[in-house]
Amino acid sequence: MMKLLFIIISIIFVINVSNSTPTLQLSGYFNVNETTNANLFYLFYESQNSPSTDPLILWLTGGPGCSSLMAAFYENGPYFVNDNLTLSENPNSWNMVANVLYVDSPLGAGFSYVVDSDGYSTTETEISENLYSFLTQFLSKYPKYSKLPLYIFGESYAGHYVPSFSYYIYQKNLGLATINLKGLAIGNGMVDPYIQYGSLGPFAYAHGMLDINALKETEGLYESCQQAIDSGDYNMTTQICNNIMDIVQEYAGNFNVYDVSKTCYPNEPLCYNFTAIIDYLNLASTKQSFGVLPNSTWNVCSTQPYSAIIRDWFNTPINYIPTLLENYKVLVYNGNYDWICNFLGSTEWTSQLKWKYNQEFNNSPRKILYINGNTISGYSQSYDNLTMQVLLGASHMAPREAPVAALAMVESFIQN
């Protein structure tokens, strides 16, 4: 009986949104490790366009240890949560153009759980193994989605997850191509700290948050940060590299590290007010409809998976990306207001990629992007399988502030 509980699936139609077309929703758990009793939770929304032919997007939120449901109800899902805990329709939901599968990963994030504490993931390989087990079970349970083009999207620390999981699928497909992976996308991602930490000072300086002396101070700290990363001493590296962040915040004040156009207030976790989402997802009725264990508590981010994987922070999956570019499309995008994983850092690591079209990509012309005819929404640079986009007016969670531009970007990427 207990084992059946681990794979319970809840199939419902969302009907409590006025003037909304019901969308097929699937949710529940798949057991990915019987030994540790490890269970990944998912929430799936079928495409509102052409579910039988539209691609499948698998979404991963970073942290590490933050729930993908945060994206589902705050960024790019079909519904937002109102202050009175009702739902309102998102006209720019990504399931307007794709089937979207949100997965709470790694184990312990969101509604996902593991009974044996030894089951928490400590490496990207373990996370990828669990995700692969989950995905193969999902596609087996729902075979009508198994042949659709698959795109893996992720945000923030998912800059580690997305390339690692994509490369894991690539390796598995060398034997027999069972998963129809076509591309991957990294939004405001932390991919290579060795490179990206160097952008924190210059970005703040360019936004008027630092003077020239403070900038020079961050440059000296960045050199020490790189040396610490090279040493392999995690504790020392964390302390030294975090000094860059501390110095910038000391000079610039209590700004929102995810959106430099805003102030971060002490009573807001992660600088945002997620109270309505937290309350909604912890309602007994919500948990019942999702097929979630009644005693589960949903949090935006969880400490146990964070503590388990955090020593992997300064490792980088960047060496996987040249191989991935040989086989799949890769999209890297950033909101221009994000500081913590900013576009300068993304531009730098993409420009340094060791792949055959490095020079051609770096020399390719940048295009201006428009929405609504003549409104500038961002900028794009592309060559062969690699595309880099900057979305104007957007933060760390780019689809929230630039929903129209983000949806257009996704549609262009997955529909060729």
From Swiss-Prot:
GO biological process: proteolysis
The protein's name in its UniProt record: Serine carboxypeptidase S10 family member 1
Primary localization class, coarse: secreted
Keyword Ribosomal protein included in the entry's annotation: no
Similarity remark: Belongs to the peptidase S10 family.
This protein's UniProt keywords: Carboxypeptidase, Glycoprotein, Hydrolase, Protease, Secreted, Signal, Zymogen
Role this protein plays: Probable carboxypeptidase.
Sugar attachment sites: 33, 84, 235, 273, 295, 385
GO CC annotation: extracellular region
InterPro entries named among the record's database cross-references: AB_hydrolase_fold (IPR029058), Peptidase_S10 (IPR001563), Ser_caboxypep_ser_AS (IPR018202)
GO molecular function term, any single one: serine-type carboxypeptidase activity
Organism: Dictyostelium discoideum
